[in-house]
């Protein structure tokens, strides 16, 4: 009887093992099986992909190809190898535009993120009327950049000099837009004024995502407001900071409308950005030359973005 029972247990155990092995093999087969793509997903994706290819990818590729030619935008052309690229790197005006654009973008992204981060902390604290204040601070988002530029241009050219004259402040008695050494500061101020609201909204979302219990525990441990900012708020919003830095720097590299409305690249060429030089070059008939300039600018922007992401990889996560 004992022998029969033992054989039954052994047989059942083998069956269980065989079933497990069969299931494992089936799982392995399922694991090797390629995932099926939902046809509905493809149906929604395909139109967007086609439009993106026709509107973005194809023109970009054609522009890169034409940058190696002497094309004027129409008619016949011939390939000129690296002639346009050599001309771009040897053009002092283009190099000046790159230096201005990079310097302006760096200063502006620091100013915008510093102010927006501090405002986000203030507007998520226990103060009265913070909802109304948030609405006020995001108003510049709905105003066109060129309109903002024209309004500030009037202020810098008329109101500010008049006020400086009234109080006897000599350095601002003349319009700073006419000063080659100070005009860039006006562009930074106006660009920051328009860019802070969108950056602020992202920071508010980041600060509100931090559980209140974390601050309560820190307060019980005797952490000061500064210590909570440095040890809790900043680290836990690092992902949002990264997003704002990358997106902001990219947007400032492409600045155009505010610069046109304020200085139109002047005085002289002291505030001419790369985007402005490319646009003016197209209007002047330097089609292939500015295509080379645009290609170089695109590569620089991508390299900067990759460096930013790699430098912060593993340190920030939403």
Regions found by a protein language model. Name each.
Residues 37-318:
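A structural signal for multi-pass alpha-helical bundles of membrane permease subunits
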